[in-house]
Amino acid sequence: CISTQVGCPVGCVFCASGVGGLQRQLSAGQIVEQAMRVRELCTDGFRLSNIVFMGLGEPLANYAATVQAIRTMNAEWGMGIGARKITVSTVGLPTQMRRLADEKMQVTLALSLHAPTDELRRELIPWAERVSIDSLIEAGKYYFEVTGREVTLEYILLGGVNDSIEHAEALAGIAK
């Protein structure tokens, strides 16, 4: 998992990354350096083959540095990691999701949904008050239409909070 920020502005109630809030953005070089350090640590025939932007921070809230880092990691002169082996995980910024689609880089987009309703999602992800699940799904459809890459849904099960049969059925409806 690669971080794009020091701290996180999102404040998900189940995640420690946002406890101190956002401290600062990382540069593209600092983002790439994390992957390079991991690659240096690889031994015994193990090689770094996949990158997930899911460490500290919201990757699409540091859009320019994230995209520049992806291009560097993907480039033959950089790390030579295939775009389809790079995943960007986001809580969902629809405008940035569409921008990423328009970059046509073929990276995998993963949407951290964590709730099947806007009301519950706002409780779990305070930042979610800015955007509806419907707008995220529309941005995800756009991403698929432009890139041909399916969007992955991420969902943390929290006992007694978002794990009922009704939640599962609603989530299945969203995933269709």
Say what each PLM segment does.
Residues 33:
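Cys/His-clustered metal-coordination modules, chiefly Zn-binding fingers
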Residues 1-30, 44:
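Canonical Radical SAM [4Fe-4S] cluster-binding loop centered on the CxxxCxxC motif
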Residues 39-50, 55-176:
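Conserved AdoMet/S-adenosylmethionine-binding subsite of the radical SAM
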Residues 5-9, 18-22, 36-38, 54-59, ...:
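Short acidic/polar capping segments at secondary-structure boundaries
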